[in-house]
Amino acid sequence: MEIRKPGLGAYITATYPNKVLFLNAVKCLSEVSDFLEVGIPTLNPKYDGPVIRKTHFAAELKGLDAINVARYGIIPTILMGYIEDYANRLELVAQVASEVGASSVLFPDLLFEHIDRLEDYVVTMRNYGLRPSFFVASNTPHRLVNLLVKYEPLFMYLGLYAATGIKLPLYIERNIREVRRLVDGTTLVAGFAINSPEMVRLVINAGADAVVVGTALVDKLGNGEECRRFMMELRGGLA
């Protein structure tokens, strides 16, 4: 299942703030998003910002138990976790992902701290009928990006480390264009500081195929209509 281009995705942490509201959010977001990223709650969300970090700590369940409460697949769904939590249990993660209807598992720390597991990760994803996905940064070596493209990933996620609510710096637009050139036709997703249709439009115009909103969604997850309205407002930036 491919990601729509241009696309709007939503990130939510599994079972935050509780199972019932999480399941309601999955249903709502599946109707107004092009894809979902579902965070696997961890005690060490080291690459997440302060708001998302709190959702990991407050989630009703932790680890794969939190993922198992729902079934996905109405739209492409990507599980997002840290490979350090599952370094010796990659097959278990892939099995759970496949069983709940996910398309891929994204590990932001794979390339930065566990590059030696790259081949294991790709093989395991494929063995369970999943597509690999990769988290890259603007300083990821070009030769590595070129290698990743050859694995035919579901997408490349470009991390840009900006804070919600600040104006997008010009250098970030430049970084998107540079990575766009490197990944060629591979789907490029960017997620950072997305809280308005203007920011969505800017990121898409810079060369991303899709954007993900996470932090700006957190305080809206308990209200289905508010969540829906916000996502539809952001979708205006794709036009």
Predicted feature locations:
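Active-site-adjacent beta->alpha loops and helix N-cap segments on the catalytic face
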Residues: M1, K19, T42-A70, Y86-E91, ...
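N-terminal amphipathic alpha-helix/helix-capping segment at the start of soluble metabolic enzymes
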Residues: M1-T13, V69-Y72, R177, A239
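Hydrophobic faces of well-ordered beta-strands that scaffold small-molecule active sites
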Residues: L8-I12, L36-V38, P76-G81, V105-F107, ...
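Catalytic cores of alpha/beta
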Residues: K19-S30, E91-A94, N139-Y151, G185, ...
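N-terminal glycine-rich anion-binding loops that anchor highly charged ligand groups
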Residues: E31-K46
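Glycine-enriched alpha-helix->loop->beta-strand junction motifs that scaffold or abut catalytic
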Residues: V32-S33, A97-S104, T124-P132, K150-Y157, ...
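Ordered, amphipathic secondary-structure segments that act as subunit-interaction surfaces
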Residues: P76-V93
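Extended, intrinsically disordered, low-complexity segments
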Residues: F230-A239
